[in-house]
Amino acid sequence: MKIGKVERYIHEKLEKKRLHFVLIDPDDTSPEVAGKLARVCEELEIDAIMVGGSTGAEGETLDEVVKAIKENYSLPVILFPGSHGGISKYADAIFFMSLLNSRNPFFITGAQALGAFRVKKYNLEPIPMAYIIVEPGETAGWVGDAKPIPRHKPKIAAAYALAGQYLGMRLVYLEAGSGAPQPVPETMVATVKKAIDVPLIVGGGIRSGEQVRKLVKAGADIIVTGTAIESAGSIEEARKKLEDLRRGVSI
């Protein structure tokens, strides 16, 4: 499968710097607020916006949020589906991911099979990604019936990541879970990064620029933040939080 426009954009930007993606969950964010957040992301030059969530927003709810983001943001909007329903024709691309450490084959290949023809019909760019849940896993781990990687076992995470690469996945995502008390451990990030040759995404539990700085220093290529922005009391507060997180990427 050829590398598409959005994936090429990611690789070209990674040649120059580490990246920061913002995750917006349509279950928790109205189209109006999503549009305002997207405008802030545009002004701060956030590298991409991901749209999705573990509880599976879909249909008109998802479409309206994606459209509001697209109206206010010129860079890629990438779907991050919790299941096969989380697909919108208005996005630029989709992380076509497999939850490698799920106990349930539905989240490894089942949901992907159910969603594949819709991705093709909408002419969405699929970006193959290995998705790995790390303790505590939070809602993503519970919904995805994952067997979370123990935080003190970085080699297990590295084994899954390398397996994902060998299966043809072109990105690896280490997920501690939205709202996790702590991010993925730096030692795990470093161990995984040494094992693989594809870009490494890290998300979940990231609340400060200092945490971002440490994760980037450990080897994260792309940092994903979501809950930290969604929980802000106002758009201006969200802007300040994003500015702090953004500074951590620029080490």
From Swiss-Prot:
In Gene Ontology terms, what is a biological process of this protein? glycerophospholipid biosynthetic process
Enzyme Commission number(s) of this protein: 2.5.1.41
A single GO CC term for this protein reads: cytoplasm
GO molecular function annotation: imidazoleglycerol-phosphate synthase activity; magnesium ion binding; phosphoglycerol geranylgeranyltransferase activity
Chief localization class?
Answer: cytoplasm
Compartments annotated for it: namely: Cytoplasm
Which InterPro entries does the annotation name? GGGP/HepGP_synthase_sf, GGGP_HepGP_synthase, GGGP_synth, IGPS_HisA/HisF
Q: Which UniProt keywords apply?
A: Cytoplasm, Lipid biosynthesis, Lipid metabolism, Magnesium, Metal-binding, Phospholipid biosynthesis, Phospholipid metabolism, Transferase
SUPFAM superfamilies the UniProt entry points to: FMN-linked oxidoreductases
Q: In which pathway does it act?
A: Membrane lipid metabolism; glycerophospholipid metabolism
Q: List the disulfide bonds.
A: none
Q: Which Gene3D superfamilies match?
A: FMN-linked oxidoreductases (3.20.20.390)
UniProt cofactor(s):
Mg(2+)
CDD domains, per database record: PcrB_like
Q: Pfam families, from UniProt? A: PcrB
Which NCBIfam families does the entry link to? GGGP, GGGP-family, PRK04169.1-2
Report the function annotation for this chain.
Answer: Prenyltransferase that catalyzes the transfer of the geranylgeranyl moiety of geranylgeranyl diphosphate (GGPP) to the C3 hydroxyl of sn-glycerol-1-phosphate (G1P). This reaction is the first ether-bond-formation step in the biosynthesis of archaeal membrane lipids.
Regarding protein family, the annotation reads: Belongs to the GGGP/HepGP synthase family. Group II subfamily.
Q: What is this protein called?
A: Geranylgeranylglyceryl phosphate synthase
